[in-house]
Each structure stands twice: as structure tokens, then as C-alpha cells.
Amino acid sequence: MKNFNTKRKNILKLTAATFAIIGVGTILFHSAAEVVLAANNGKVEKVPTTYQVSGSSETTLPKVTENGKDKESGSVKVNYTLSMDSMNTGTPTDTDLTMEEAAEAGAQYLRDIFVLDLEGAYVYMSYNPGTVTFPRAFWAGDVLFQKERTPESTRWTYMIDAVTGELFNISYDRQLDVSVPLGYDAALEDDCGIYAQSARNKTEECKLIDGSIDRIEYNCQGYSGNDPTISVDVIGGNGEIINMSFSRYDQTFLGLITDTSRKVTESALDNMVGEM
């Protein structure tokens, strides 16, 4: 069990370290993790790494209903171009949110957490019924303000429960226009106070945890493209954990992984170990 605990800790740290680029390939990340786990388990078997591709349909959502607001939710409607991602798409079931509903839920999370206005944005959606390392059906959104998508594009991404719309993770990815060191900063492991305070402020501002915050702990460091990152864990008095990522270059908030997402991943790993 000691070996597994070490492995799980490393995988969770890897998840946090690569969090800033999860939106560029959420499904690819989980698929790669499955390949690694299968190799580590000594199994010679195929695991899902690709998904069916269907034709891309594109539509622009209506701007207004009454007084510029949606009649049911009261939220302001905006124009953004919505497409099913041609690179990766599954087939949602009757109980899943539609692509349009999932996109609206994602847009609300982006407004609430990043204060992002999607007017004029391009939103690419992907549906996945779940993977070995994340066995929950989910919708993933990739949001840009340019039609062409490249690894260097500035983007906001999210992953939500396909049925309930609950947030699993959300992130912001950018390419810096300056060259900065990407190496490990040992001092931050002992003192990440500036990031801990930023995490506390964001958690309280967005009411991300039910109840009070118990403590904030250093998690790991990494980088996304040419942007050095640091992740910290915000731990609530009820045991809830939110993993947050920031830029080590200018302390910009880069996103978060929710407690539900963490529990889904850990449960999947526990089940995999139990089958060994």
C-alpha cells in the first residue's frame, strides 16, 4: 500500500502541475494517464486513447430574449460561435446536457470565476462518456477569441459533469511575450504566502468552499508553455480540497480543480489498485 500511496501522490501532483494545459487536451491528458498506468501495471492491453470524430456543426447563439436577458435564468445572453470539436466528440445520452446547455453552464463558470465576457468568442465543445482514470461523463469546452486554434493560442477551458453541469476544472492558458525562467524555485516550497493569500481571496470571492477555510498548502510547481506555474491546495474545515494554479511570473490566477474532480480521480485509482 505504501507504493500505491506514493504512486497516487505523484499522479495527483502531475495532474496539478499540468493543470494549466488541461483545457488544450483534457481528454488527451486522461488518456495518456491510462496508457502510463497500464504500462506500470504490467498489463498488455489496449486502453481508450482515441474517440469517434463526427462532422462539426456550428451555430451562433441568440443574443437576447427580453431586456437582453434569458427569460428563465435572468442571465445576460451574449453572441459566441459554438461548435462541436472535430478532433474529439462522443455521443451524449438522453440524460446528458445538450451541447448548448453545457456551453451555457461553462460560460457562467467563466463569468463567475474569471469575470470573462464571451461576446465574440469561439467555443469548441467535446463530449466524453468517461475514461479509466476519470469514469464520469463530461463535457469539455475550449474558448478562444480567434477562430484558428494553435497550442500557443490564449484560451479558457473547462470540464463539467455531463448530466448535472457541476464544475470539475476550469483554466486559463496563455503565451507570455517575454522569456522567463521555468525552473523549480525551492524557496516557494517553504513559503508560498503570496499565492496562498491569492488562493484564499479567490476562494472566498467565488464561494468555492462550503464553510470556512482551514488551511492552504503548497502542492507543486511546473510550467505551461513558457509560463511558470505553482499549485496550492485550499483545504476547507469540512475536508473539501480545491487545487488552484497561479503563474510564478506575475501571480495571475490560472485556474482550479474542484474537490469532486479530485474524489472521482482518487476513487478510480483506488478501484484500479483493488483489481490488481
Locate each region found by the language model.
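Exposed beta-strand-loop-beta-strand "reactive/processing" segments of non-cytosolic proteins
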Residues: 114-163, 214-259
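Structured segments of extracytoplasmic/periplasmic soluble domains
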Residues: 108-116, 142-146, 198, 202-206
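Long, charged/polar, surface-exposed segments that mediate recognition or autoinhibition
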Residues: 88-100, 156, 160-215
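A eukaryote-biased signal for long
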Residues: 14-17, 73-78, 239
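N-terminal, intrinsically disordered, polar/charged segments of Gram-positive cell-envelope systems
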Residues: 2, 30-115
